[in-house]
Amino acid sequence: MSNLLLYLLAYLIGGIPFGYVIAKYFAGVNIKEHGSGNIGATNVLRVLKKIDPKRAKVLAGLTLFLDAFKGAFVILVAKFIGVCDATLWTLAVIVIIGHCFSPFLKFEGGKGVATTAGALLVLIPYAVLVGLVVWFIMAKTVKISSLSSLTGILVGIFSAYILYLHPSIESHAPLWIIAFIIVYKHRENIYRLVTGQEKRVV
């Protein structure tokens, strides 16, 4: 299988908008028209708690799992067929781009945190676990999803420099490309954080 075909498949798989589909199918809601308009688990939880509070956490959890799973799935399949490390990292970047700029939603999409965690869990698991611990602590204490996610991502990247001194592709550049995408997708959240307007998840 050529790399170009792999890249296309990674982009299409990454673009599957699970949050949008789940909210539409199970609650009859266009998630893009409610709350923050984001298709991620946080907005699914926030919006569905008002409509179907009994199932909101389950559906948000399912969204989180599937968004992470598609990132891991792409990398696991690529490893199984034996592609090189450089291609694996390229696929990781592309599956995240697919999620953030979905071809199925007119190139709009989520913010990439769960898909990043899934893809990188296969490539640099220890760094991801460090980031997840930080994210979890922040989420439980500060209860601001965007701040928790951004902090977890940055801590995970910096920990990769310690835990993976000799990265398989001789560079940590893909991590910073991914970080840039996620920060870009959170630009409105960052503005609200700076101005004290960002909402908590309760």
Q: What are the residue ranges of the model-derived segments?
A:
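Cytosolic, membrane-interface loops and tails of multi-pass inner-membrane proteins
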Residues: I22-K57, Y191-V202
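Core segments of transmembrane alpha-helices
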Residues: T63-L76, V113, L129-L132, T151-G156, ...
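Helix-coil boundary and interhelical linker segments in multi-pass alpha-helical membrane proteins
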Residues: M1-L9, F73-T90, L121-V128, Y161-P174
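N-terminal signal-anchor transmembrane alpha helix
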Residues: M1-A27
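Interfacial segments of multi-pass membrane proteins
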Residues: L45-D52, A78-I81, G98, G112-V142, ...
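Nucleotide and nucleotide-moiety/phosphate-recognizing core
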Residues: I51, L59-F65, K70-P103, V134-F136, ...
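Loop-to-transmembrane alpha-helix initiation sites
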Residues: L129, S145-I153, H166-I178
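Short, non-helical or kinked segments that cap or interrupt transmembrane helices
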Residues: V29-G40, F104-A117, I144-G152
